Amino acid sequence: MPTHLNLRYAEIESLWPGVEALQGLADEYGIKDVFQDAGGKMLQLAIATGLDLVPGRTGPDARDRIGNLYEVKTVDMAGKKSGGFTTNHHMTKDTIARYRNRRWVFATYDRITLMEAYLVEAEDLEPIFRKWEHDLRVKDHLNNPKIPVDFVREIGTPMYLKDVPPPWAVRATTGVTENDISSGVSA
């Protein structure tokens, strides 16, 4: 740890152009500050999944190019074997009704690094929605119920897995086509 305030000034100055370049990319996605509200994480996720981010703190988090709306939930799994995605600090029946009309993207991170992202259809979350509704019979709201990461991994369709390139990227770098793959040709 530095003992003098300016000991690492040259280091941060040399790194800063990369941060500014990252912010320039984030500007294209409507992210005003990569250091606020998980801006850098949302930028990485938007690029990895091809979703457009919806600005604001209320309503859907993202939409795809054909207009489907998405809830996006993230969790930092650094140092954890299991965990859960937080949802809403004031979960009500109205919130659940809204959730039933959206697709979902769940993403796990190792600190700032996107590790995996899964697409989950609302109907696949129905067991969780029903449990929440059952719990709401005796309460006016639930305080941030979680959706287990392992459950999402079980029911979700992978959209992104770190270190596993998507099929289009493999073709782009190797020149191997789907016909080559089906006929047994390798790179």
Regions found by a protein language model. Name each.
Residues M1-A187:
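Nucleic-acid endonuclease domains
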